[in-house]
Amino acid sequence: MPRTVIIDGDILVYKVSTGIVEEFEDEECIFQTVSWGNKEQAKQKVNDLIEKITKDTKSTDYIIALSDATNNFRKTINPNYKGNRKKIKPILWKFLREYLTTNHKTYEKPNLEADDVIGILATSEKIIKDDKVVWSMDKDFKTIPCKFRREFPNGTHESKIIYEDEADWWFMYQTLIGDRVDGYDGCKGIGDKTARKILGDVGEKSLKEMWIFLFLQMVMLFQSKQQKSV
């Protein structure tokens, strides 16, 4: 049966570009770290990794999801988004992105991250019509309904199916509590306990019902604050 593996291109590029770079520091002066990487080694390694991922996921084809390299709608809305990340990309980052887009099957959309693109590819019945599986090393894929294979740095992996009701619940949960690592604070005053109380158990409410319930909770909270201020 035909199967396409949707590869997290950001993770792919980062894994390869950081794995073969050498660094040198001159500590006798005001030092600057100098890095260099071998382009041929990088191409060979990324080709080998794509082949391995395709084989490991028992896929017959692959597509690589990439982030828009210049714009990100989240940073337009929230300038603090991922503000704690290093500003300088690994030295082979740009080269590998260009190599992938020129020599491999890639997919990207303006203003979107690879995660968003993966969500589109995994849930669309028109773009990829056959069986699909997502590959990444990122833990934050609970919000996408899909077959998912997560690789760990030590070489082990985890394979699971994320069902739609579970994905919807985690989407709402993360919307409420935020993600401090990425610089998104979520809804003020709502932590894990309150979020779980609002949402209930996985599958208890549909996505629409969770949105309505949340909206009503916010209205009640606003009215309560208004009454206290009178």
Where are the regions that the model predicts?
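Non-catalytic, usually N-terminal nucleic-acid engagement modules in DNA/RNA processing proteins
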Residues: M1-I63, S67-D68, R74-T76
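Extended two-metal-dependent nuclease catalytic cores across DNA- and RNA-processing enzymes
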Residues: P2, F31-T33, S59, G83-V230
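Short acidic, glycine/serine/threonine-rich loops at helix termini
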Residues: S17-T18, K75-P79, I144-R149
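Intrinsically disordered, low-complexity, Ser/Thr/Glu/Asp/Lys/Arg-enriched terminal regions and linkers
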Residues: Q41-T54, T70-K82, L92, E98-Y99, ...
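Short, glycine/serine-rich, charged loops/turns that create anion-binding
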Residues: A69-T70, K139
